[in-house]
Amino acid sequence: MTTYAIIDIAGKQLWVEPKRYYSVNKINVEIGKKIALQRILLLSKIGEKIKIGQPFLNGISINAIILRHFLAPKVIVYKMQPKKKTRRKRGHRQHLTSFLINDF
């Protein structure tokens, strides 16, 4: 069993572990800045009982550092209507932020 938590960040719920890298939808924070994640849904540490928030845990924060902002690989959307000569091709690249979980 390892130490892990489930957090709510940028509209997504993530299972996170210490000393690991994660990417989520863009967060408007400068690169290199440390942030405290306080929207924790569940926390499990080795040798302790699992803590479940309702909906969030109070008084607990997870420290993280912003590493970079980048674009995800391009997704191509191609729409076509048969027998109509109607074709539409669009591309989209999502803005993402990568961060490192330091400690709980």
From Swiss-Prot:
Xref: PROSITE patterns: RIBOSOMAL_L21
Record keyword rRNA-binding present: yes
Single GO cellular component term: cyanelle
GO biological process: translation
Keyword rRNA-binding: yes
Role, per record: This protein binds to 23S rRNA.
Quaternary structure, from the entry: Part of the 50S ribosomal subunit.
Key words, A-Z: Cyanelle, Plastid, Ribonucleoprotein, Ribosomal protein, RNA-binding, rRNA-binding
Family the entry assigns: Belongs to the bacterial ribosomal protein bL21 family.
Name of the protein in its database record: Large ribosomal subunit protein bL21c
One GO MF term: structural constituent of ribosome
Annotated localization: Plastid, Cyanelle
Organism (species): Cyanophora paradoxa
InterPro entries: bL21-like, bL21-like_sf, Ribosomal_bL21, Ribosomal_bL21_CS
